[in-house]
From Swiss-Prot:
InterPro entries: Universal_stress_protein_B. Pfam families: UspB. It is a multi-pass membrane protein. This is Universal stress protein B homolog. The chain crosses the membrane at residues 6-26, 86-106. GO terms for cellular component: plasma membrane. It comes from Vibrio vulnificus (strain YJ016). HAMAP family: UspB. Belongs to the universal stress protein B family. It is found in: Cell inner membrane. Keywords: Cell inner membrane, Cell membrane, Membrane, Transmembrane, Transmembrane helix.
Length: 107
C-alpha cells in the first residue's frame, strides 16, 4: 500500500516543478515585455521585479494585467502567447499549492 508520506512528497515535488516552470515563464515574459510593451515594463518595475527590494504594488499591477486579460488587445503574438502561458501556469501553481496544503492537513 502507498504510504501517505509518499503521496505528500510526490505532490510537493510536482508543485515545486510547476512553480519553477511558472517563475521561468514569468522571467521570460518580463524579458519579452521590455521590447513588446515598454510602458507596462516600467509600470511593473521590470528591472527590479525579482530583486529583494522589488515593489509589491507594481508586481500586483502585473497580476491584475494578466487576470483581466488586457493583453488580448496587444499586437505582438509572442507577447500575448507568453502572457497566456504565464496566466495558465499561475493558476496551475496556485491550485497545486492548495491541493498540497490540503493533503498535508488531511494526511
Amino acid at each position: 500500500m502507498i504510504n501517505g508520506d509518499i503521496i505528500l512528497f510526490a505532490l510537493m515535488v510536482v508543485t515545486g516543478v510547476n512553480l519553477a516552470r511558472y517563475l521561468t515563464a514569468l522571467r521570460s515574459l518580463i524579458y519579452i515585455m521590455r521590447e513588446a510593451h515598454p510602458l507596462l515594463y516600467q509600470q511593473v518595475d521590470g528591472n527590479g521585479f525579482f530583486t529583494t527590494h522589488g515593489n509589491v504594488t507594481k508586481q500586483v499591477r502585473l497580476y491584475h494585467y494578466l487576470k483581466s486579460k488586457e493583453y488580448h488587445h496587444h499586437h505582438d503574438e509572442v507577447f500575448t502567447g507568453k502572457c497566456d502561458r504565464v496566466r495558465e501556469l499561475f493558476v496551475l501553481s496556485v491550485s497545486l499549492t492548495g491541493v498540497t496544503l490540503l493533503a498535508a492537513f488531511l494526511l
